[in-house]
């Protein structure tokens, strides 16, 4: 039994190899592209909408509401990035119902890449919200001696984000393999249902943690935020 999709090699030439992580990552992206085109090709602003558009609106509005609850600010600037993370991870895990499929989130390289996306998104959103000087000043809080610790804290959060998702998905794969060897007829059905639920939960937690990190970097004084809002609406 392969613990990670990196161990499943389909083709290798010298130092270059084509493993299950790459194959199934492209599969997930392909499903997302085709699914997005299929659902959005006939979008309508009327009250009579298709089931696909209705499902899409439920997902988008649900993600936006969750972001809104976390940051207590307009969620639209963060919705594309956080929504993409959630949908990609959730779909990667949900496709596990397909025989032979191995979730790319079970590879440390995939979870590290996702965590790096969050790592670079944090300062981008922070600078956009607070400016370069305002963003860099937070590393000197509460006093300049905390600078190295604040920097280490940023790196440690990203490492924890990558390892946490990888560990949960890999451990799920190991448990399924053990139960299949013990009772191959009864436990697979239960584990499939539990695996689907766990996959969505892991995607939700990853997206929430990413949003928390971004919100911490782009947090502005609430009084200033309210004043700016009043000026823009006044």
Curated annotation (Swiss-Prot):
Key component of the proton channel; it plays a direct role in the translocation of protons across the membrane. It is a multi-pass membrane protein. InterPro entries: Alt_ATP_synth_F0_Asu, ATP_syn_F0_a_bact/chloroplast, ATP_synth_F0_asu, ATP_synth_F0_asu_AS, F0_ATP_A_sf. GO terms for cellular component: plasma membrane-derived thylakoid membrane; proton-transporting ATP synthase complex. The chain crosses the membrane at residues 20-40, 78-98, 107-127, 169-189, 194-214. This is ATP synthase subunit a 2. Keywords: ATP synthesis, CF(0), Hydrogen ion transport, Ion transport, Membrane, Plasmid, Thylakoid, Transmembrane, Transmembrane helix, Transport. Belongs to the ATPase A chain family. GO terms for biological process: proton motive force-driven plasma membrane ATP synthesis. The keyword Ion transport applies. It holds the Pfam family ATP-synt_A. F-type ATPases have 2 components, CF(1) - the catalytic core - and CF(0) - the membrane proton channel. CF(1) has five subunits: alpha(3), beta(3), gamma(1), delta(1), epsilon(1). CF(0) has four main subunits: a, b, b' and c. GO terms for molecular function: proton-transporting ATP synthase activity, rotational mechanism. It is found in: Cellular thylakoid membrane.
């Amino acid at each position: 039994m392969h613990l990670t999709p990196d161990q499943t090699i389909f083709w290798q030439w010298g130092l270059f190899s084509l493993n299950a992580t790459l194959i199934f990552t492209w599969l997930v992206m392909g499903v997302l592209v085709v699914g997005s085109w299929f659902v959005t090709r006939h979008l309508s602003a009327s009250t009579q909408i298709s089931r696909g558009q209705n499902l899409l609106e439920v997902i988008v509005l649900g993600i936006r509401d969750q972001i809104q609850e976390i940051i207590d600010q307009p969620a639209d600037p963060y919705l594309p990035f956080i929504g993409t993370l959630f949908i990609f991870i959730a779909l990667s895990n949900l496709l596990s119902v397909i025989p032979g499929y191995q979730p790319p989130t079970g590879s440390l390289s995939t979870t590290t890449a996702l965590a790096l996306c969050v790592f670079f998104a944090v300062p981008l959103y922070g600078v956009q919200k607070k400016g370069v000087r305002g963003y860099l000043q937070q590393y000197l809080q509460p006093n300049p001696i905390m600078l190295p610790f604040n920097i280490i804290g940023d790196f440690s959060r990203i490492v924890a984000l990558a390892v946490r998702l990888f560990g949960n998905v890999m451990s799920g794969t190991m448990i399924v393999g053990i139960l299949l060897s013990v009772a191959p007829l009864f436990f697979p059905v239960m584990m499939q249902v539990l695996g689907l639920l766990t996959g969505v939960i892991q995607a939700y937690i990853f997206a929430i943690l990413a949003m928390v990190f971004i919100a911490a970097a782009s947090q502005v004084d609430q009084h200033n935020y309210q004043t700016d809002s009043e000026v823009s609406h006044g």
